[in-house]
Amino acid sequence: MDDRARALLKALIERYIADGQPVGSRTLSKVFDLSPATIRNVMADLEELGLIHSPHTSAGRVPTPRGYRMFVDSLLAVRAYQFEPAHIGELLPVSEPSRAVNAAAALLSNLTQFAGVVLTPKRTQIFRQIEFIRLSDKRVLLIIVTPEGDVQNRILSAQRDYTEAELLEAGNFFNVHFSGKSFDAVRRTLSTELAQLRDDISRLMQAAVEAGAEAADDGEAVVISGERKLLDVTDIASDMDRLRKMFSLFEKKTDLLQLLDVSSRAQGVQIYIGGDSQLVPMEEVSVITAPYGVDGKVIGTLGVIGPTRMAYERVIPIVDITARLLSNALSHNQ
């Protein structure tokens, strides 16, 4: 494809993204020093290549998924997005990893007015410290602190009432012998270590291990923010079937998890266009993702879900810098 055809395709897609109306040769002739007849010939070539097509109700042309793919891969000029540093520091807190992840999803949604998603880090089930607190007769609160500083609570049903001194003894034993290990590793070595303790304390410790392992597996793998903003996107909200598919994607999350998992193994920003990528189940939807990590190690992925007709040159740098900001926030928490 020659430079003239590439320039016309770029202009057509940019115009369509801007106003959502099929683009005709007369419109493009105002941009290029070419006759409408010449432009129609070029558009016919682009249509033959599968890059644009004509809706039934219009003589103009709109981009196909393949056209969008060529646009984002080789025609798009992306500039760095400018943030106010102080403002971002407030939006991505470093005090708690879970807060930073939720804030990143909200930031993506607020800046793009689409849905922001974050694939949360896979839990390693490692704990730094645990504590037992007596709640009432035969009820004990288990407090688990992860190496990242996250705090998780579980209520244990005990077989008898424990004194505060006994619970302190059990917690100290656990922290001295098992801190820095996973609950699965603790489970494997528990029998020999617990021989040093009374039988009733051993049962409490075993209950703590099971609750800790369960806590590590709990929680949403995907954090989603702003999905309702897609109700304001005409390309999606104007069709009830599209809306049902969209919210089914958010509800079931299987396809979304697969896409985010695949993108976490890729380098840098990835753009998945519906109709072009099998990972996106809807032709009217695009997903832009970027991996984030701690100290150079990728631990998750985040992104934006929006219409295929989106301002890619604006959304791409937002996703990129949010991934960098989240990585920075999580690294500072170590």
Swiss-Prot record:
InterPro entries for this protein: GAF-like_dom_sf, HrcA, HrcA_C, WH-like_DNA-bd_sf, WH_DNA-bd_sf, WHTH_HrcA_DNA-bd, WHTH_transcript_rep_HrcA_IDD
Protein family membership: Belongs to the HrcA family.
Signal peptide annotation: none
Protein name per its UniProtKB record: Heat-inducible transcription repressor HrcA
Single GO molecular function: DNA binding
Gene3D superfamilies reported for this sequence: 3.30.450.40, Heat-inducible transcription repressor hrca homolog, domain 3, Winged helix-like DNA-binding domain superfamily/Winged helix DNA-binding domain
Highest taxon in the source lineage: Bacteria
Tagged with keyword Magnesium: no
Biological function: Negative regulator of class I heat shock genes (grpE-dnaK-dnaJ and groELS operons). Prevents heat-shock induction of these operons.
Keywords: Repressor, Stress response, Transcription, Transcription regulation
GO biological process terms on file: negative regulation of DNA-templated transcription
